[in-house]
Amino acid sequence: MLKIGSCTVLFNPDRDVISNVETYKDLVDVCVVVDNSEKKNEVSKYFEEESSYIYIDMHGNQGIAAALNAGIEYLHSKNMDMALTMDQDSLFPTSDYLAIYQID
């Protein structure tokens, strides 16, 4: 079975981001949230404190490439076979996820 991790980059997120990430967090083996915000807000603190997420604080806006690299490096260190990269506004329907397993 493939080991799949997700990497979601945050930038000044609003509360809707939590429900967006929750559409796919249980579909992956590891769910990394990389915070690229200038200041932490209540959403940042939620991901930092919730044990079902790996929270990486970039300590300010380092750019999306640096944030994605940080998340993917973490997933690589955990020997994930695939990385699902998402932005904070994205949802992931279960049917789309299941299609991954049909790839030859």
Please state what every model-predicted region is.
Residues T8-L10, D35, M86:
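Short beta-strand/turn micro-motifs composed of small residues
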Residues S90-I103:
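Acidic donor-binding/catalytic loop of UDP-sugar-dependent glycosyltransferases
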